[in-house]
Amino acid sequence: MEAERRRQAEKPKKGQVGSSLLPERHPAAGTLTTMVDSSAPPCRRLPGAGVGRPRFSPQGGQRGRPHSRRRHRTTFSPVQLEQLESAFGRNQYPDIWARESLARDTGLSEARIQVWFQNRRAKQRKQERSLLQPLAHLSPAAFSSFLPESSACPYSYAPPPPPVTCFPHPYSHALPSQPSTGGAFALPHQSEDWYPTLHPTPAGHLPCPPPPPMLPLSLEPSKSWN
């Protein structure tokens, strides 16, 4: 009985490692534990530490993000703006020679002047679109409100008269001409009974008027007044 108790006491419990077995089976385990125990306690890591921080390369530059170029804003003087606006009013698309000439006058670089003209044209197009945008939403009925009403118009136009149909004159013979006496112009004698009697015509139709009398031409040379 005593021998069995000794055997059970010598057997290690489940889940525990005997201290006598460590040096024999794992001789380096003791040194490892002593090194861990003798080291300083581990630093406590703050929550979120190191998250979202950019990494830097050994050369000192930021890794993973390209360097963004910083834009320099040019400030124009009132005199320069006046010269640029005057040139823009003459020509909105100046060539290289016009830009170089303007650069000498204003003291700016040709590249700055080219960028200014591009921005100025974009600004003008934006202003034109803003002016045309309210008119695009108007309906045709809204446009009629801008027109004057017919009652307010000071002028009134009468409707055109109906067309009149002319019938040929019943007398188609030529008028009798009288011989000229003394070489002077002689008007033909027109009697009162020369005009024909108007015959009744259908309603809405009038006869054509008679042709005008023809005057004879004189062949004698014109007399001088001297």
From Swiss-Prot:
Chain residue ranges for the region called Disordered: 1-75, 181-226
GO molecular function: DNA-binding transcription factor activity, RNA polymerase II-specific; RNA polymerase II cis-regulatory region sequence-specific DNA binding
Biological-process GO terms, alphabetical: pituitary gland development
DNA-binding region: 69-128
GO cellular component: nucleus; transcription regulator complex
Compositionally biased tracts (Low complexity): 216-226
Compositionally biased residues, Basic residues: 64-74
Keyword Plastid included in the entry's annotation: no
Tagged with keyword Repeat: no
Sorted UniProt keywords: DNA-binding, Homeobox, Nucleus
Subcellular location: Nucleus
Functional note: Possibly involved in the ontogenesis of pituitary gonadotropes, as well as somatotropes, lactotropes and caudomedial thyrotropes.
Record family assignment: Belongs to the paired homeobox family.
Protein name: Homeobox protein prophet of Pit-1
Species per Swiss-Prot/TrEMBL record: Theropithecus gelada (Gelada baboon)
High-level lineage: Eukaryota, Metazoa, Chordata, Craniata, Vertebrata
